[in-house]
Curated annotation (Swiss-Prot):
The gene is murQ. It comes from Synechococcus sp. (strain CC9605). HAMAP family: MurQ. It catalyses: N-acetyl-D-muramate 6-phosphate + H2O = N-acetyl-D-glucosamine 6-phosphate + (R)-lactate. PROSITE patterns: GCKR, SIS. One of its GO terms (molecular function) is ether hydrolase activity. Pathway: Amino-sugar metabolism; N-acetylmuramate degradation. NCBIfam families: N-acetylmuramic acid 6-phosphate etherase, PRK05441.1, PRK12570.1. This is N-acetylmuramic acid 6-phosphate etherase.
Amino acid sequence: MAVFDPDLQPSSDRGHLLTEQSNQRSSHLDQLDTLALLELFADEDRRPQEAVAAVAPALAQAVDAVANRLRAGGRLFYLGAGTSGRLGVLDAAECPPTFCSDPQQVQGVLAGGSAALLRSSEGLEDIEAAGRADLEERGFSTKDCLVGIAAGGTTPYVRGGLAFAKSIGALAIALACVPTEQAPLPCDIDIRLLTGPELLTGSTRMKAGTATKLALNTLSTAVMVKLGKVYGNRMVDVAASNSKLVDRSLRILRDLAGVERERGLTLLEEAGGSVKLALLMAAAGLSVDQAKAHLQQYDQQLRPALAAYGAQLAEA
């Protein structure tokens, strides 16, 4: 049972926010049979995809800006509280195994820290200064990027972080699910995922959360494509850290370079587990040291590195 704190003061009335409004389609939610309930959920869950598609120009601007900063040595931070913060942590955690990126390159910062991943700590979102403090603790600087995530656009913790990022000349990106005029945020790029009122009024872990996850997937993956972590549609910088990913690495070598499994294992071992190096070694006939130097010359971009040797891979 929740414990009510009589000393806790309510926020200003947030009833005008899109995410707090009642969805008329679900006014009898508690009276629907199970199938009708699930069909309604499925129908409303089309809205997140539509919301992400509608902000493609702003997302593209964010991708290019973040990629440029990461290429120059900057980092990407997701900052949020509750569901929004947890989604940022999730996306950041997936980057190292998928793209073999430095764990410090993309970071999720959640109000309340790691304990808030498992146990709700929403009260911490009310402290605006904490957003700045959590970034400062991580050495956030002018060359870095911040995505401040707040479904309702009013979270003081996120506002504080975005204001700090703006004040030092870092890239500040706001991600919210209400129109800008309802909850303006200090930012350089403003992304508004308008998913509409939730079926369960105010429960932004639903459509707003789904849209946020889709947008973060898109942002981080597109940035990594720009950084040369992908060839065709293959994750050629995958970290072969478990049996499944070793198998995936071997299949990438087979499909793109025609390397059979036994030879692929040898190449992977020589390349220290780097699929990208192994592909360049196989296609251009290079030693591991030659492949490393060549990739460095081409800023870790596999396609131009191959082209310099007149080599190419399949596009499967």
